[in-house]
Amino acid sequence: MKKNTHPEYRQVLFVDSSTGYKFVCGSTYQTDKTEVFEGQEYPVCYVSISSSSHPFFTGSKKLVDAEGRVDKFLKRYSGIKQSAPKPETVVEDVLPKGKKKSPAKKKK
């Protein structure tokens, strides 16, 4: 086998940026940042979502997102007034008295 073809597999500290939850897992993630966790120094990777903040695992229905697309949208359009819904208009067929509608033609 060729040497130096595979990335280095090592223990990496993953930190959930929304909850602060930390866990160590084997990974090939490359970083220069390090952090001390449980007395050992690990390379660190900051993630936006993990099992401690994902709605599937937490059971909550709301997703905590740090400045996501929804927040940007709400900031942009928060000053716009929402128009009142338009009332529905009912259109009825009005025929003069004594006239009947012709029956619909059947297709063959």
UniProtKB/Swiss-Prot annotation:
<dbReference type="GO" id="GO:0006412">
    <property type="term" value="P:translation"/>
</dbReference>
<protein>
    <recommendedName>
        <fullName>Large ribosomal subunit protein bL31B</fullName>
    </recommendedName>
</protein>
<dbReference type="Pfam" id="PF01197">
    <property type="entry name" value="Ribosomal_L31"/>
</dbReference>
<feature type="compositionally biased region" description="Basic residues">
    <location>
        <begin position="97"/>
        <end position="108"/>
    </location>
</feature>
<dbReference type="InterPro" id="IPR042105">
    <property type="entry name" value="Ribosomal_bL31_sf"/>
</dbReference>
<comment type="subunit">
    <text>Part of the 50S ribosomal subunit.</text>
</comment>
<keyword id="KW-0687">Ribonucleoprotein</keyword>
<comment type="similarity">
    <text>Belongs to the bacterial ribosomal protein bL31 family. Type B subfamily.</text>
</comment>
<dbReference type="InterPro" id="IPR027493">
    <property type="entry name" value="Ribosomal_bL31_B"/>
</dbReference>
<dbReference type="GO" id="GO:1990904">
    <property type="term" value="C:ribonucleoprotein complex"/>
</dbReference>
<keyword id="KW-0689">Ribosomal protein</keyword>
<feature type="region of interest" description="Disordered">
    <location>
        <begin position="86"/>
        <end position="108"/>
    </location>
</feature>
<dbReference type="GO" id="GO:0003735">
    <property type="term" value="F:structural constituent of ribosome"/>
</dbReference>
<dbReference type="InterPro" id="IPR034704">
    <property type="entry name" value="Ribosomal_bL28/bL31-like_sf"/>
</dbReference>
<dbReference type="InterPro" id="IPR002150">
    <property type="entry name" value="Ribosomal_bL31"/>
</dbReference>
<dbReference type="GO" id="GO:0005840">
    <property type="term" value="C:ribosome"/>
</dbReference>
